[in-house]
């Protein structure tokens, strides 16, 4: 596992965006051989999306031959709702870059057959071979996507009941009213994430410090689903300074020295 220790949320977003752009450009995608990118929602990736849009407008990257798969979507929330992940992605990213509409894949939380929707999503991912890079965030309790504590580390795309803590955390997007936050969501599984060629998780804020410690210094444990990254051959965790407060000094020093060349120029 790589740990990229940075100072601020802005630096985390810039590093993540630069990493994605470098991966896309090195891949040299075409219509017949697209780059497949997994994407998250929420507050954490906003600085990364902003930086990606800026790099696109500066001519540094094209998304014309990029195919995206989003991590999750609420169940029962109309896609036109301002807090649906469909709306979030278009508002913060898709509407500002040159990605073709047919290359965008989002789970449908209003599908008449939820099980079929989840199966078809997995099959569509497999039809591209694999996701080349999956970017994600992490919850205070260590969940990735909506794989809440005690999720199977072999899980695939499915419906999940959201914990009360997750709904409280997300209520900030629903006028602070937890009762407006949907109780269920569709989410890719831990196994789906582990199938990606590379997984990059962004971690921001002191409230995520225990989750980061569990990921880096703890054991693989389904109560902290972020710890599954230890099983992945190409995992990258990009974090700001407040989120490192639970890490041992020697751990942080080790990764600072290891990644010194890779955190320049931010």
From Swiss-Prot:
It is an enzyme of class 3 (hydrolase). The record marks 151, 158, 160-161, 254 as: Part of the allosteric site. Keywords: Allosteric enzyme, Carbohydrate metabolism, Hydrolase. CDD domains: GlcN6P_deaminase. Its EC number is 3.5.99.6. PROSITE patterns: GLC_GALNAC_ISOMERASE. GO terms for molecular function: glucosamine-6-phosphate deaminase activity; identical protein binding. This is Glucosamine-6-phosphate deaminase. The gene is nagB. Belongs to the glucosamine/galactosamine-6-phosphate isomerase family. NagB subfamily. The active site is at 72 (proton acceptor), 141 (for ring-opening step), 143 (proton acceptor), 148 (for ring-opening step). GO terms for biological process: carbohydrate metabolic process; glucosamine catabolic process; N-acetylglucosamine catabolic process; N-acetylneuraminate catabolic process. The keyword Nucleus does not apply.
């Amino acid at each position: 596992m790589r740990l990229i220790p940075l100072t601020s949320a802005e630096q985390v977003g810039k590093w993540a965006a630069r990493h994605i752009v470098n991966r896309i450009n090195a891949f040299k995608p075409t219509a017949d051989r697209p780059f497949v990118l997994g994407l998250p929602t929420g507050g954490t990736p906003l600085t990364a999306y902003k930086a990606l849009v800026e790099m696109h407008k500066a001519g540094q990257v094209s998304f014309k031959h990029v195919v995206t798969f989003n991590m999750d979507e609420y169940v029962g929330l109309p896609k036109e709702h301002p807090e649906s992940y469909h709306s979030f992605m278009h508002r913060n990213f898709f509407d500002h870059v040159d990605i073709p509409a047919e290359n965008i894949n989002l789970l449908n939380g209003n599908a008449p057959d939820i099980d079929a929707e989840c199966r078809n999503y997995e099959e569509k991912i497999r039809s591209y071979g694999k996701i080349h890079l999956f970017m994600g965030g992490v919850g205070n309790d260590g969940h990735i996507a909506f794989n809440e504590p005690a999720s199977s580390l072999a899980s695939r795309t499915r419906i999940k009941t959201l914990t009360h803590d997750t709904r409280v955390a997300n209520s900030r997007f629903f006028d602070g009213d937890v009762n407006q936050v949907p109780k269920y969501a569709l989410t890719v599984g831990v196994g789906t994430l582990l199938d990606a060629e590379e997984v990059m998780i962004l971690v921001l804020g002191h409230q995520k410090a225990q989750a980061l410690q569990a990921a880096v210094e703890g054991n693989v444990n389904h109560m902290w689903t972020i710890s599954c990254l230890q099983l992945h051959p190409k995992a990258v965790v990009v974090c700001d300074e407040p989120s490192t407060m639970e890490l041992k000094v020697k751990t942080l020093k080790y990764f600072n020295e290891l990644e010194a060349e890779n955190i320049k120029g931010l």
